[in-house]
């Protein structure tokens, strides 16, 4: 059942979850000049996820053998999925360069999301906007740096602001600020908000039914409590599916933006058109020995 931080019902009726469940109490805090630092359950879970993902992948690849087995085989399966189905499928052959980052990104977001249904934890760290914003900022920084290194700052920003060089001047004047806002502001913002909103709303909905079952089961209307409990179980399974989907979408869009920066045709729309979530998949060289070649 949900943690004690959730307001429960006593004799005054049922109380559903409030946004306070996403604001855990600080375990300790300190000031560093004008900046306040605090450490709480969210901080601990975020640190745990980072150490878990890093340690898991390190253990899987630290003693790689020609024929992968056990943990190495599992880790390479994850890497191959991201490398072939996301990096190369969206970016192209050059996507291999970004496969390590995309793999870590996918695994980190996935484990962070799954924290919502792990006993004791029961808190998706991506349901706090700070973490999705940081992840989006890192992806934003990478695809812009890639574009600048690939084409030079002048060409990259010119192609971004003027995606249609043959268009009339007044069209260019209208498009330039729109393209700037779209690439430099809207992309990282939508990456962060999409992930945050899905995890926040999903966890709130799950809490409603879990709290409803906890409140109704001891009552004469216990049948409704059973229904609420079954809904909580069903929503847990549904949330697991959403956890995977949101990690996949975030990673695919990051790959699409990197691919767009490499092609520098409209700053990313070209690559986005070829991403699986835009309904068009390109062929990618799939080799059964892909993991062996890297090992």
Swiss-Prot record:
Keyword flag Protease: no
NCBIfam families: ATP_synt_6_or_A
Membrane spanning stretches: 41-61, 101-121, 129-149, 161-181, 191-211, 222-242, 244-264
A GO term, aspect molecular function: proton-transporting ATP synthase activity, rotational mechanism
SUPFAM superfamilies assigned to the protein according to its UniProt record, in alphabetical order: F1F0 ATP synthase subunit A
Any one GO CC term of the record: proton-transporting ATP synthase complex
Keywords associated with the record: ATP synthesis, Cell membrane, CF(0), Hydrogen ion transport, Ion transport, Membrane, Transmembrane, Transmembrane helix, Transport
Any single Pfam family the record assigns to this protein: ATP-synt_A
Sequence similarity: Belongs to the ATPase A chain family.
Cellular location(s): Cell membrane
Function of the protein: Key component of the proton channel; it plays a direct role in the translocation of protons across the membrane.
Subunit structure as annotated in this protein's UniProt entry: F-type ATPases have 2 components, CF(1) - the catalytic core - and CF(0) - the membrane proton channel. CF(1) has five subunits: alpha(3), beta(3), gamma(1), delta(1), epsilon(1). CF(0) has three main subunits: a(1), b(2) and c(9-12). The alpha and beta chains form an alternating ring which encloses part of the gamma chain. CF(1) is attached to CF(0) by a central stalk formed by the gamma and epsilon chains, while a peripheral stalk is formed by the delta and b chains.
Identification of the protein by name: ATP synthase subunit a
Mode of membrane association: Multi-pass membrane protein
Main location per the UniProt record: membrane
Organism for this UniProt entry: Parafrankia sp. (strain EAN1pec)
